[in-house]
């Protein structure tokens, strides 16, 4: 397989990184509730059990605790005061197998909980609990067990152990083991439509002005204000889920999100909160009502109603304010969300969805990334290509013409190359401004970009130290200058091929690749044509007598050759600009 194919497979593999819960077991955020944010109700009847080696203990005792049952992926074990199961963890644990279990600090108490280290399947976990000096009279062990993402049990009650002579106690049921009944959801009988967009409801559509009733490829999100609540309708093609988020800025993080996840023959609808670039933290559905969904021909549709203002929790934003709005889709399996494989659709500014109804579009590429791509295309498709051809083939065309004290071909070449350096430097900085760091998910593209940047800066530095034409070092400079420039151009083209299909600037496939191949072939063809033309002129000159060579400089053949070069150059520039405008127009449409 060719390197480009391998790279695309690598990108696809990276794109399928799951945004799951905590496969590494670092679940300190769930210490008190012991509940994973998986967006599914826990199972009611536990199939796992907790056993202890003795039921009477004294402070300082070391008691063996065993969690066992059918195979499971993750777990969280704590000991709590049996008379206050909603309180803090009590005591500390030690491990018997650090390969599958790890100690956590909960409620500021070191080693007071134990969790898994990976998603490796387990049948049994053995631990030792150490009773503290100020231990309560009765201790009960609790365990949360995750069999797979949407199948888990919360606070499975274990045996109660007591200190000597402590009065008997009746077992209590932990609150999280009480089954949570989600609000009922209805099945939508017909598709959403765009009627009322911009007049009675706020709409976001991509492609612009598409109608989800007739176009299955339409990504559609609408908000209809109804008193103190808002009715939300969301539709789009999706293999696993579609979602939208309200954000204070144009970057992922600290966002109020809503997920519609395909599960078997239905759709699970949940609010969520996104902290930084981590996976969504699924929240309770209590804030949503009138939940409904529809699945048909690969299109996911869901609707729900929520109040404009929800004081608690704070993760639910006030819909009376303005936000950037994101609309994303991606894969999901067994309720497990995977990272979206393309850039989310995003509004170009903040909107208040409960203010005046509007009908807007969006972009899947941030403006700053569009500028990056546009500048790189201009620099490495047009300015550098024309500049190189001028330097290689047009020195004899204007042998005596000068501009500001330098030969005209050199001034044109220098102007185009300075423009290339300027555009490259500015474009190089833009992704770092947007990301804030060196992207690890962009494959080889950023590495090639850094290489191009180094070579681009090196070229004018070399030019400053260019030796005079008559010195022997001029030949070394010429070869070094040519090799550095050629390497930069080849690597830049490779970087453009890879960059066109990255998430942040995903140009339409497969025409983007074919168009870039067309540009490369066009440039190579013109380059070879001018090279062949020059070779023919040189061969013709060598066949002439020695006394005729001096006449060649002013012969009709030479003038005809110059005219041919000018015609070819004019046609080349027109073709080059056609390719460039095609790419710039595609970027503008993102």
Curated annotation (Swiss-Prot):
SMART domains: B561, DoH
Cytochrome b561 domain segment(s): 334-533
GO molecular function: metal ion binding; oxidoreductase activity, acting on metal ions
Pfam families referenced in this protein's UniProt entry, alphabetically: DOMON (PF03351), Reeler (PF02014)
GO biological process, one term: intracellular iron ion homeostasis
Ranges for domain DOMON: 217-330
Main location as per UniProt: membrane
Cofactor binding notes: Binds 2 heme b groups non-covalently.
Glycosites: 478
Protein EC: 1.-.-.-
Keywords, comma-separated and alphabetical: Electron transport, Glycoprotein, Iron, Membrane, Metal-binding, Oxidoreductase, Transmembrane, Transmembrane helix, Transport
GO cellular component, one term: membrane
Residues annotated as binding heme b 1: 372, 445
Cofactor: heme b
Transmembrane spans: 2-22, 371-391, 416-436, 445-465, 482-502, 517-537, 567-587
Amino-acid positions noted as binding heme b 2 in the UniProt annotation, renumbered to this chain: 413, 481
Domain spans labelled Reelin: 12-179
Annotated compartments: Membrane
Membrane topology per record: Multi-pass membrane protein
Protein family (similarity comment): Belongs to the FRRS1 family.
Function: Putative ferric-chelate reductases reduce Fe(3+) to Fe(2+) before its transport from the endosome to the cytoplasm.
Protein known as: Putative ferric-chelate reductase 1
Gene name of this polypeptide: frrs1
């Amino acid at each position: 397989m060719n390197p480009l194919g391998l790279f695309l497979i690598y990108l696809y593999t990276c794109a399928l990184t799951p945004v799951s819960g905590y496969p590494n077991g670092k679940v300190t955020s769930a210490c008190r509730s012991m509940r994973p944010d998986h967006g599914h109700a826990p199972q009611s009847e536990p199939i796992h059990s907790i056993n202890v080696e003795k039921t009477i203990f004294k402070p300082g005792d070391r008691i063996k605790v065993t969690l066992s049952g059918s195979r499971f992926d993750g777990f969280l074990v704590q000991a709590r005061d049996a008379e206050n199961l909603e309180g803090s963890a009590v005591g500390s644990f030690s491990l018997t197998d650090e390969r599958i279990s790890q100690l956590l600090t909960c409620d500021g108490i070191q080693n007071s909980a134990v969790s898994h280290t990976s998603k490796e399947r387990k049948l049994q976990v053995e631990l030792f609990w150490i009773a503290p000096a100020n231990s309560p009279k009765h201790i009960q062990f609790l365990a949360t067990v995750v069999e797979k993402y949407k199948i888990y049990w919360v606070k499975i009650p274990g045996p109660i152990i007591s200190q000597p002579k402590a009065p008997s106690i009746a077992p209590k049921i932990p609150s999280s083991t009480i089954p949570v009944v989600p609000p009922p959801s209805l099945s939508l009988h017909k598709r959403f439509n765009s009627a009322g967009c911009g007049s009675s409801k706020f709409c976001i559509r991509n492609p612009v002005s598409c109608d989800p009733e007739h176009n299955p490829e339409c990504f559609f999100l609408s908000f209809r204000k109804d008193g103190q609540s808002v009715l939300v309708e969301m539709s789009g093609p999706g293999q696993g889920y579609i979602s939208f988020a309200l954000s204070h800025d144009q970057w992922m993080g600290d966002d109020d999100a809503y997920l519609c996840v395909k599960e078997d023959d239905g759709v699970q609808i949940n609010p969520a909160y996104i902290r930084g670039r981590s996976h969504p933290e699924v929240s309770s559905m209590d804030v949503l009502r009138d939940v409904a969904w529809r699945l048909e021909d690969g299109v996911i549709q869901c609707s729900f109603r929520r109040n404009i203002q929800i004081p608690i929790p704070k993760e639910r934003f006030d819909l009376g304010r303005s936000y950037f709005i994101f609309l994303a889709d991606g894969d999901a399996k067994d309720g497990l969300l995977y990272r979206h494989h393309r850039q989310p659709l995003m509004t170009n500014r903040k909107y208040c969805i409960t203010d005046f109804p509007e009908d807007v579009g969006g972009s899947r590429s941030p403006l700053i990334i569009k500028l990056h791509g546009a500048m790189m295309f201009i620099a490495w498709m047009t300015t550098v290509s024309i500049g190189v051809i001028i330097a290689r083939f047009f020195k004899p065309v204007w042998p005596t013409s000068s501009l500001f004290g330098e030969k005209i071909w050199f001034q044109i070449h220098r102007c185009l190359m300075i423009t290339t350096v300027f555009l490259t430097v500015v474009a190089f900085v833009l992704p770092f401004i947007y990301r804030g760091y060196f992207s690890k998910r962009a494959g080889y593209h950023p590495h090639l970009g850094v290489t191009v940047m180094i070579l681009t800066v090196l070229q004018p530095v070399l030019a400053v130290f260019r030796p005079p034409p008559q010195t022997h070092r001029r030949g070394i400079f010429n070869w070094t200058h040519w090799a550095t420039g050629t390497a930069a151009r080849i690597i830049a083209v490779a970087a453009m091929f890879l960059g066109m299909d990255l998430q942040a600037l995903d140009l339409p496939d497969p025409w983007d690749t074919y168009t870039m191949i067309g540009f490369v072939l066009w440039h190579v063809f013109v380059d070879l044509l001018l090279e062949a033309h020059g070779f023919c002129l040189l061969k013709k000159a060598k066949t002439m007598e020695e006394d005729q060579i001096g006449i060649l400089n002013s012969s009709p053949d030479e003038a005809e050759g110059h005219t041919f070069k000018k015609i070819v150059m004019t046609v080349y520039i027109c073709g080059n600009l056609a390719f460039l405008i095609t790419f710039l127009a595609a970027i503008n449409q993102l």
